[in-house]
C-alpha cells in the first residue's frame, strides 16, 4: 500500500432510518503490485490543484449531484455515481497522457469520462446493461481538455510568458502585421501606440 486517501464528502446522503452513522467518507487505497513496481505520482500536478501546497491524503469533495448526475425519467441512473472531481484528482495524480486506464466496474462511466477528458486511453467493464448504455451515451458527448491546460497540469507550472510589447520592441512582430488564433477564427492587427 502506497497510501490510503480519505474522501470526505462535503454533502453526504443522510441515514434517514437513523440506524447507523451517516456514510460521510470513503477510503481509497493506492497500491502497487510490489515494493519494486514502478508507479506514477504527479506531485507537481497535485500541487498545481492545491494552491501550490503539497496534496494531503484527506480530500474534501462533494458527492455527485446537479447536472453531473445521470438521470433517466427523473431517477438516478446509478446510486453510487462518483463525482468527476474525485476521478480527475486520482487520474491526474497517478497517470500520464496516453496511459491506459482500466475500470473493471464501469458503472455510469465516470472514470472513462475523466480519462477521455484528460487524454488517457481507457477500458471499462460493466455487466449491467443499463449502466453500460448510460456510460456509452455519456462518453459520446465528452470532449478532451485542451492540451495547453493538460500540459500546465502535468508539468505543474505554466510555461513562461513573454510580455507582448517586447515582441514588437525586439522586432519579432512588425507593426501592421495581422495575427490569428490557432483556428484562424480570431484576428488582430498589431498597432503602435
Positions of predicted regions on the chain:
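Core catalytic lobe of class I
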Residues: 1-134
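PRPP-dependent phosphoribosyltransferase catalytic core
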Residues: 133-193
Amino acid at each position: 500500500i502506497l497510501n490510503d486517501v480519505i474522501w470526505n464528502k462535503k454533502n453526504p446522503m443522510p441515514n434517514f432510518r437513523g440506524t447507523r452513522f451517516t456514510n460521510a467518507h470513503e477510503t481509497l487505497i493506492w497500491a502497487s503490485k510490489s515494493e519494486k513496481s514502478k508507479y506514477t505520482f504527479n506531485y507537481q500536478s497535485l500541487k498545481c490543484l492545491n494552491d501550490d501546497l503539497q496534496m494531503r491524503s484527506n480530500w474534501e469533495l462533494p458527492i455527485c449531484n446537479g447536472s453531473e448526475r445521470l438521470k433517466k425519467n427523473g431517477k438516478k441512473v446509478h446510486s453510487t455515481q462518483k463525482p468527476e472531481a474525485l476521478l480527475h484528482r486520482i487520474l491526474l495524480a497517478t497517470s500520464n497522457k496516453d496511459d491506459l486506464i482500466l475500470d473493471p466496474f464501469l458503472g455510469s462511466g465516470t472514470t472513462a469520462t475523466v480519462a477521455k477528458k484528460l487524454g488517457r486511453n481507457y477500458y471499462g467493464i460493466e455487466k449491467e446493461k443499463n449502466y453500460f448504455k448510460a456510460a456509452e451515451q455519456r462518453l459520446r458527448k465528452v470532449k478532451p481538455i485542451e492540451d495547453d491546460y493538460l500540459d500546465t497540469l502535468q508539468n505543474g507550472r505554466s510555461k513562461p510568458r513573454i510580455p507582448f510589447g517586447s515582441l514588437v520592441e525586439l522586432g519579432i512582430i512588425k507593426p501592421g502585421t495581422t495575427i490569428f488564433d490557432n483556428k484562424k477564427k480570431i484576428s488582430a492587427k498589431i498597432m503602435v501606440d
